[in-house]
Structures are given as C-alpha cells and as structure tokens.
Design a protein with these regions (language model features):
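Acidic (Asp/Glu)-rich catalytic clusters
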Residues: 1, 17-23, 34-48, 61-76, ...
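N-terminal pre-catalytic "stem/leader" segment of glycosyltransferase-like enzymes
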Residues: 1-14, 23, 32, 244, ...
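Hydrophobic faces of well-ordered beta-strands that scaffold small-molecule active sites
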Residues: 4-10, 26-30, 44-50, 76-80, ...
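Glycine-/proline-rich flexible loop or hinge segments
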Residues: 45-56, 94
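Active-site acidic/histidine proton-transfer and metal-coordination neighborhood
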Residues: 60-159, 169, 252-255
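C-terminal helical cap(s) of enzyme catalytic domains, especially alpha/beta-barrels
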Residues: 248-272
Length: 272
C-alpha cells in the first residue's frame, strides 16, 4: 500500500520551517498565481489548485493556461469546484433537491466537466465538494447533493476531490451526520483529500483553521477507510492551513504548522 503525498498550503512561514528541517512535506499547494508558484518552487515541489467554477456562469480560468501550468509544475489533476449558482439557474430554488432540479444541475455540471476533459482528459479532472451554507446564499443545494456529485463522476469518468471540512460545514447546515453524507459521495473515485480545522469564528463556522482534536479524529476515520480498502488511496492529502494575503495571513501561525504538519505526516505515512 503506497501512501498519499502530503501537501500543505504554501506560506513563507512554512517554507522557513521546511528550510530549517523542522517539518517535512512532499509538496506545496498553491493557487494559479505566477509569483506564488515561483516562490514555492524555489523551496520545493508544488502543485496548482485552480479556481475553476463548475455550474457557474463562467469557468473562471483560461484552460490553455491551466494546461501549461500543469505541465510546468507536474500538477497531475485539473480540479473544479461544484458551485451551481442562482445566476445560472434563476428558476431553480436554492434549496431544491427534487428530481428535476438534480437532473438539470447534474447535466450542466457534466457539460462543464467535459469542457475540462476536452483539454486534459477526463482521467485528469477532479471535482470538489464545496460547503453549503443555506438558502440565503448563492450556491444551489443540488450542487452538494451526493446523488448529483455521483452522477457527475459516473457520466464523465472524472475523479473526486473530497474536502472533509467542506463536508462538515455542509452537514452542520443541513443537520446531517458527517459520515452518512460523506459515505454517500462517490468515494470510490477519490483522488485527493483536503483537511483543515473547523470551529466558530465571530459566530460563524469557518474552515482553514488549526486542527482540533475532533478534526484529527475525522482525519483518522478517513484514513481508516483507506486502510480497510473501503476507499482508494488518493494521490494527495492536503492540509489547507496557512497562506498569503489578507484572507490567510491571520491564520498562518508558525507554531501551528510546526506542531500539526508533523502530526499529519505521521498519519499519512501510516498508510505506507
């Protein structure tokens, strides 16, 4: 059994820890920003996580550029976020998960995935579950429905990028059990796993935070499914903590990285 590669969001504090030999990772996770890709590659291998929006009014990326960045960095998969929007489906209620809403949303998502597959091949496309925040937000609930996600994977032959924190946020909104939801997703197609801490910040549940004991338990449970053969071993497990810019700098603590990256490295290595 080969273990997944451990990736962590690139940040200067993380790069300093890597350079000092205080933590070990397999590669950095970076957005499709040329300057950040260059900074990460100066410190070690990296892969690109693209801002592709599936089910929105536009994909949000230049697919030819994405293909070139994949080649330049060795990024193995072109990811897309399953984000069907009210703008694209003005006559579908946000909370509608009836058969017709699911059919329409799935058909549009399949069409968008096929646009990606035409550039890189379906086997190199992965789709990511995103957090559903309720009917007062713009994301259609059908986009997080496991039946829709499963149909997209079945119809296109793409893989799944499972974000455990996003799944937790979704199930908290819907009042569902986390594992009932996750196990209904097409985990047989798992290619990449994202993990991060989830806790309330200013009265709202947020992710991309330090792991709590509960978060670590969720990661252990996911890895146990891989160890038991219920899930395939993904290519990467990415710790989505830290980063650059105002969105991430306030949650980029070197002490957290120094403690939690080795913990995740140990957990991931246990699969090898």
């Amino acid at each position: 059994m080969s273990r997944p590669r451990l990736a962590v969001n690139y940040s200067p504090p993380l790069a300093q820890l890597v350079a000092a030999g205080e933590v070990a990772i397999d590669l950095y996770k970076v957005p499709d920003w040329d300057d950040l890709i260059a900074a990460a590659r100066a410190s070690g291998p990296c892969y690109v996580h693209f801002p592709v929006d599936l089910g929105a009014t536009r994909l949000g990326v230049d697919l030819d550029r994405a293909r070139e960045l994949m080649r330049a960095t060795g990024t193995s998969s072109l990811n897309g976020h399953l984000v069907p929007s009210r703008e694209r489906f003005p006559d579908v209620a946000v909370g509608d998960v009836g058969a017709e809403a699911r059919r329409r949303v799935a058909a549009a998502l399949v069409e968008d995935v096929q646009a990606l597959a035409a550039v890189v091949g379906a086997e190199d496309v992965i789709v990511e579950n995103v957090p559903y925040r309720g009917e007062d937000h713009g994301l259609l609930r059908a986009g997080v429905d496991p039946r829709v996600v499963s149909e997209v994977v079945r119809a296109t032959g793409c893989g799944l990028l499972l974000d455990l924190s996003h799944a937790l946020l979704t199930t908290r909104t819907l009042g569902m059990d986390l594992w009932e939801y996750v196990d209904a997703l097409p985990t047989h197609a798992l290619r990449e796993l994202h993990v991060s801490g989830v806790r309330p910040v200013d009265g709202k549940l947020r992710d991309h935070l330090p792991l709590t004991a509960d978060d670590v338990a969720v990661v252990r449970a996911a890895l146990a499914r891989m160890r038991a053969g219920a899930w395939p071993i993904p290519d990467k497990v990415a710790f989505e903590y830290g980063g650059v810019g105002p969105v991430f700098e306030w949650r980029t603590d070197p002490d957290v990285l120094a403690e939690q990256v080795p913990l995740l490295h140990e957990l991931v290595a246990s699969l090898g």
